[in-house]
Curated annotation (Swiss-Prot):
GO terms for biological process: DNA recombination; DNA repair; SOS response. It comes from the Bacteria. ATP binds at G65, P66, E67, S68, S69, G70, K71, T72. Belongs to the RecA family. The keyword Cell membrane does not apply. Can catalyze the hydrolysis of ATP in the presence of single-stranded DNA, the ATP-dependent uptake of single-stranded DNA by duplex DNA, and the ATP-dependent hybridization of homologous single-stranded DNAs. It interacts with LexA causing its activation and leading to its autocatalytic cleavage. The lineage of its organism: Bacteria, Bacillati, Bacillota, Bacilli, Lactobacillales. Its main location: cytoplasm. This is Protein RecA. SUPFAM superfamilies: P-loop containing nucleoside triphosphate hydrolases (SSF52540), RecA protein, C-terminal domain (SSF54752). Disulfide bonds: none annotated. One of its GO terms (molecular function) is ATP hydrolysis activity. NCBIfam families: tigrfam_recA (TIGR02012). It comes from Enterococcus faecalis (strain ATCC 700802 / V583).
């Protein structure tokens, strides 16, 4: 009886592979890529909070938070890391607000960055689908979901009611995109804004626009919020920012990364490296003084950060020690992993 069932199962598997192609069904243990492939986020603290050393490839990421909290900065750092590792990046600028000079300061190669500023939400999502399906893109950032305005709303009159249009658009798009994103190992980052539900007496009134589909399809959801202002004398030079992993399908969620986002510079690599090294006792802290290998490197956090910025050899050494202490790799090269990607047929 058991042999009959095995023969029947083998016949069914062969039929499925014949109809839908090799690899359409397999035993979980046979799948070659069991280890989660990642791309560094551009922030060591965020790599640790994500639990797998970066953004998982072939997955959807949602980055949301209040205005000017650092959502686009976090996403641009991811693009810079992809390009640094030999990958190709695209930016769908639905808000029409990308600053090329700022992106360049964060390490983005703007000459190689693919940019689209769509007129409608449908156009933006179709462009994203075409790029992902090509199999030649490693990361695509959509900024933002709230700005993906349906064509019917743009063509209609100001003030006209269009209930649920954007939610339906996002639901349909994600149903179509999720499969090709996974097959081509593309990272899709959706930046989102915050809205408040009217009449909520208890609980959190905050929600994100675009319906519930993105919440379900996202493997990782990051909440970005400003914690405090950073001052140098009387001048405000940046913000202390908390990035909370509110959803994570590849590692335990609810971890928090604290980073310094400096105006005109982006995430301070020195600041997060200093904090993480102190936490692992790789850099000593006595009162206001910081020390490394019996040598004092600065009084006060800002001075210690400046010392590290002025001594790149020491920073590279500490970075390696911190990565080893937290079990984070240097990030794999994208070009090698991309060889296994397949190009998907575009819809006619």
């Amino acid at each position: 009886m058991a042999d009959d069932r095995k023969v029947a199962l083998d016949a069914a598997l062969k039929k499925i592979e014949k109809n839908f192609g090799k690899g359409s069904i397999m035993k979980l243990g046979e799948k070659a890529d069991q280890k989660i492939s990642t791309i560094p986020s551009g922030s060591l603290a965020l790599d640790v909070a994500l639990g797998v050393g970066g953004y998982p490839r072939g997955r959807i990421i949602e980055v949301y938070g209040p205005e000017s909290s650092g959502k686009t900065t976090v996403s641009l750092h991811a693009i810079a890391e992809v390009q640094r590792n030999g990958g190709t990046a695209a930016f769908i600028d639905a808000e029409h607000a990308l600053d090329p000079q700022y992106a360049e300061k964060l390490g983005v190669n703007i000459d190689e960055l693919l940019l689209s500023q769509p007129d409608t939400g449908e156009q933006g999502l179709e462009i994203a689908d075409a790029l992902v399906s090509s199999g030649a893109i490693d990361i695509v950032v959509i900024d933002s979901v709230a700005a993906l305005v349906p064509r019917a709303e743009i063509d209609g009159e100001m003030g006209a009611s269009h209930v649920g249009l954007q939610a339906r658009l996002m639901s349909q798009a994600l149903r179509k995109l999720s499969g090709s994103i996974n097959k081509t190992k593309t990272i899709a980052i959706f930046i989102n804004q915050i809205r408040e539900k009217v009449g909520v007496m208890f609980g959190n009134p905050e929600t994100t626009p675009g319906g519930r589909a993105l919440k379900f399809y996202a493997t990782v959801r990051l909440e970005v919020r400003r914690a405090e202002q950073l001052k140098q004398g009387t001048d405000i030079v940046g913000n202390r920012t908390k990035i909370k992993v509110v959803k994570n399908k590849v590692a335990p969620p609810f971890k928090v990364a604290e980073v310094d986002i400096m105006y005109g510079q982006g995430i301070s690599q020195e600041g997060e490296l200093l904090d993480m090294a102190v936490e692992k006792d790789l850099i000593s802290k006595s009162g206001a003084w910081y020390g490394y290998k019996e040598e004092r490197i600065g009084q006060g956090r800002e001075n210690a950060k400046q010392y590290m910025a002025d001594h790149p050899e020491m920073m590279a050494e500490v970075s390696k020690l911190v990565r080893d202490a937290y079990g984070i790799g240097d990030g794999s090269t994208i070009t090698e992993e991309a060889e296994g990607q397949e190009e998907l047929p575009l819809d006619e």
